[in-house]
Amino acid sequence: MTCAYLAFTDTGLALAKRLAAALPGSVARCGQDGTSLAEWTGVQFVQSDALIFVGAAGIAVRAIAPHCKSKTTDPAVVVVDECGRFAVPILSGHLGGANDLARTIAAVCGAVPVITTATDAHGIFAVDEWAKHQNCMVLEPERIKLVSGKLLAGQPVYYWTDIPVTGTAPAGLFPAEAPEKADLALTLCPTGQALHLVPRIGVLGIGCKRGTSAEALEAAFAAFCARHGLAAQTVTAAASIDLKQNEPGLLSFCQAHGWPVRFYTAAQLRSTPGQFTPSPFVQSVTGVDNVCERAAVLDAGGSLFYPKFACSGVTFALACRPFAPDWRWQNG
């Protein structure tokens, strides 16, 4: 987590430096070296994962107000009084990690973490915080309040999962009979009106003809996702053979999705263990019988989830990194 600290007095600056020694980040003092509150907040809101104001909560609230957009994208914001007595998360408590950060800051300086989110106050399951710690994306953040609202009202919440989850489900959660009857679903392939948590574990293996455009790859990817009902958000990286490392279309396609793409030699791909879909033509061109499946599995270090899919000169396969969700996670 990239932290940025802003203090307003000498006392606050000393505390900010103390916190930064334990939780590294940039430290600035308002009014010093040309630092203005508005400019600092605007820059750090975009560049940092967490903003820590060492001063009054009112100042922080007014400073961040023009920049707040969405609980899925806003950074964590924590306010610490300059005497180090209280650490108060005021933005992105769960998805942004502000609640956890406030607890950590409190442990460093001896403050009291002031956590005001309802689920934490009542000691019940916080689905968005759990999702963050399980490396899952919340597809429909507007549905978080529906799940939390049921739990707060003492009503049952029914969940569906395609993936085994270690431990016993938290109080108030019960397995659903079918995905369509779930309030909450942990899956790579969302259906129905549940709040869907999508594990960020997928690696997309790519094969393509020379000169394939980014637009052609995008169309093929849409068809691949539609074929399997796959949430595109599960993909976090891409992989292919080194013969494709200078393909403009492939590079642009991956960049547009924010995926790092790694390239492997034919020898590396051949040595990847597993059962793969062979192609004599691919073998003759690349020196290995399959590119997309082997590249995905090699890069993921896990298992093949969806095998080779061909569309207009493009081949895709999906492999998943090891993933072990656990109900037993809870705040320290």
Question: Each predicted region: which residue ranges?
Answer:
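C-terminal non-catalytic interaction/assembly regions of soluble proteins
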Residues: 237, 241-296, 300-304, 310-314
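Terminal alpha-helical anchor/extension segments at protein ends
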Residues: 199-204, 220, 288-332
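N-terminal basic/disordered segments at the start of proteins
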Residues: 1-29, 307, 312, 319, ...
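Short, structured coil segments at secondary-structure junctions
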Residues: 23, 109, 256-257
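Class I S-adenosyl-L-methionine
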Residues: 2-15, 24-65, 252, 268-286, ...
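Conserved mixed alpha/beta catalytic, RNA-binding, or beta-rich assembly cores of soluble enzyme
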Residues: 12-18, 34-36, 44-99, 104-108, ...
